[in-house]
């Protein structure tokens, strides 16, 4: 049996996340204590609007994911392959030994600020389109771009693709998609046009930041968002720089894991969004998610099967 561990991205954040894990597991508490007092307050008892903000959601989710990965590691649960959705890629890289916790937190805070700055003054949104095939939506995207800017941000799973861009561009593509037979469209709880060309200023800022970052040896194979596979000759920093303004090939990443022999996947949440993507992409993979302390106990029993 080969095990994959995957980490959730922005949009999965929720007020109250990590409360019980913080109380029970010292290794989780150590990770969450790397957050500022204000970030911990927002995570535990803030408002939905506060935790949605990029500069809050990203470090909180990173600390949550790293904390859970340390709980699993202490219990001897180790991935054969790992990946994460957008922000979650940094959590995966940290769990694989590429970044220290402190380095990852510094990079993510920088990334969040750069992405928020790139979003300033833009009237942009993200939306999930359900029930359309990849090539059809790509052609509709080109048509919508005749009126306003919109890009494909995430290929989550067959039948669910996320679009991102100006409010006018996304609205136009939603209209075209529904006319073409999409089951429905759904606006997402994020605060910027992520994984589009609007993020090029953030990408350039990250390229400069990475010049001062120490990259450790990768102890677990990581599947990267912007290529949907392990790296070959590509540098990690180049893949992360490209990631912020490129499409995320999450469905291809899960297929890659399956082709490498992965039969079980643990999603580190909060939430179960990625588990849903896995089930729709590779039905033969068994998947379970972690959000609470009770979920940790469920995972231990699940792995014994």
Language-model regions, residue ranges each:
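Non-catalytic positions within long, well-ordered alpha-helices that form the structural scaffold/packing
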Residues: 73, 178, 258-261
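A short, acidic, amphipathic alpha-helical segment used as a generic capping/interface helix at domain edges
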Residues: 245-262
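A short, flexible low-complexity segment enriched in Lys/Arg and Gly/Pro that occurs
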Residues: 60-65, 243-250
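Alpha/beta catalytic cores of group-transfer enzymes, especially the acyltransferase/condensing modules
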Residues: 10-12, 37-40, 96-246
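FabD-like malonyl-/acyl-CoA
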Residues: 1-136, 142, 188, 264-294
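Short, charged, surface-exposed secondary-structure boundary motifs
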Residues: 296-302
């Amino acid at each position: 049996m080969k095990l994959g561990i995957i980490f959730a991205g922005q949009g999965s954040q929720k007020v109250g996340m990590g409360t019980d894990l913080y109380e029970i597991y010292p290794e989780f508490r150590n990770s969450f204590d790397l957050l500022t007092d204000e970030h911990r307050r927002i995570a535990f008892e803030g408002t939905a609007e506060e935790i949605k903000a990029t500069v809050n959601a990203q470090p909180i989710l990173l600390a949550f994911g790293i904390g859970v990965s340390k709980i699993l590691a202490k219990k001897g649960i180790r991935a054969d392959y790992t990946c994460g959705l957008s922000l979650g890629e940094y959590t995966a890289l940290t769990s694989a030994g590429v970044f220290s916790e402190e380095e990852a937190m510094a990079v993510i805070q920088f990334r969040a600020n750069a992405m928020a700055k790139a979003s300033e003054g833009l009237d942009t949104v993200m939306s999930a389109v359900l029930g359309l095939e990849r090539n059809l939506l790509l052609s509709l995207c080109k048509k919508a771009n005749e009126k306003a800017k919109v890009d494909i941000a995430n290929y989550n799973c067959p039948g669910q693709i996320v679009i991102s861009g100006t409010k006018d561009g996304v609205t136009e593509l939603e209209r075209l998609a529904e006319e073409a037979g999409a089951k429905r469209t759904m606006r997402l709880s994020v605060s910027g046009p992520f994984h589009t060309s609007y993020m090029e200023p953030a990408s350039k800022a990250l390229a400069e930041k990475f010049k001062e970052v120490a990259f450790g040896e990768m102890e677990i194979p990581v599947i990267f968002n912007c290529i949907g596979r392990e790296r070959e000759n590509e540098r990690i920093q180049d893949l992360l720089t490209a990631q912020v303004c490129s499409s995320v090939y999450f469905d291809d990443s899960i297929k890659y894991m399956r082709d490498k022999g992965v039969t079980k996947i643990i999603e580190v949440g909060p939430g179960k969004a990625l588990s849903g993507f896995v089930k729709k992409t590779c039905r033969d993979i068994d998947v379970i998610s972690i959000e609470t302390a009770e979920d940790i106990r469920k995972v231990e029993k699940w792995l014994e099967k």
